[in-house]
Amino acid sequence: MSAPLIVLVGPMGVGKSTVGQLLAERLGTGYRDTDEDIVTAQGRAIAEIFVDEGEAAFRTLEKEAVRTALAEHEGVLALGGGAILDADTRALLAGQRVVYLSMDVEEAVKRTGLNAARPLLAVNPRKQWRELMEARRHLYEDVATAVVATDGRTPEEVTQAALDAVELKEA
């Protein structure tokens, strides 16, 4: 069985996709995003899945997407912000090189505007984001082998910090 070089976790808008693509380039490997896997397989946006089928149905799809990607992908893998909510998914991450990209709420506002395209943040986005982070922070920390703060850093700086944190050398 193969395993990803690095798995990225963290809240929505933290930069997992951007940093993941930069990491893949610097390591000379592929990049994969489980949210994109779900969108491709379902033929619709994640927000539509939430509206049409509910969060529980989405989390089931997400769990399977993560399981498949962990088994198939050998490069850099980015997980959706809520993937770590599932205990089985957290168990699958044991033994993986997992980097938790963190940010505070002010950084989240700057990066995402905490906009309505985020289905879990549709009402009072700042309050919702804080509550999500209070519920998830310890789960991100539990699965992480390294934590990289992204606040005030460029994607390139975060990428270098992630490489340094997991002691990987560029290709």
From Swiss-Prot:
ATP binds at G13, V14, G15, K16, S17, T18, R118, R153. It catalyses: shikimate + ATP = 3-phosphoshikimate + ADP + H(+). Mg(2+) binds at S17. Binds 1 Mg(2+) ion per subunit. GO terms for cellular component: cytosol. Its cofactor is Mg(2+). It is found in: Cytoplasm. Keywords: Amino-acid biosynthesis, Aromatic amino acid biosynthesis, ATP-binding, Cytoplasm, Kinase, Magnesium, Metal-binding, Nucleotide-binding, Transferase. GO terms for molecular function: ATP binding; magnesium ion binding; shikimate kinase activity. SUPFAM superfamilies: P-loop containing nucleoside triphosphate hydrolases (SSF52540). Pfam families: SKI. The keyword Metal-binding applies. It is an enzyme of class 2 (transferase). Substrate binds at D35, R59, G81, R136. GO terms for biological process: amino acid biosynthetic process; aromatic amino acid family biosynthetic process; chorismate biosynthetic process. Pathway: Metabolic intermediate biosynthesis; chorismate biosynthesis; chorismate from D-erythrose 4-phosphate and phosphoenolpyruvate: step 5/7. Its EC number is 2.7.1.71. PROSITE patterns: SHIKIMATE_KINASE. Belongs to the shikimate kinase family. Catalyzes the specific phosphorylation of the 3-hydroxyl group of shikimic acid using ATP as a cosubstrate. Monomer. This is Shikimate kinase. The lineage of its organism: Bacteria, Bacillati, Actinomycetota, Actinomycetes, Kitasatosporales.
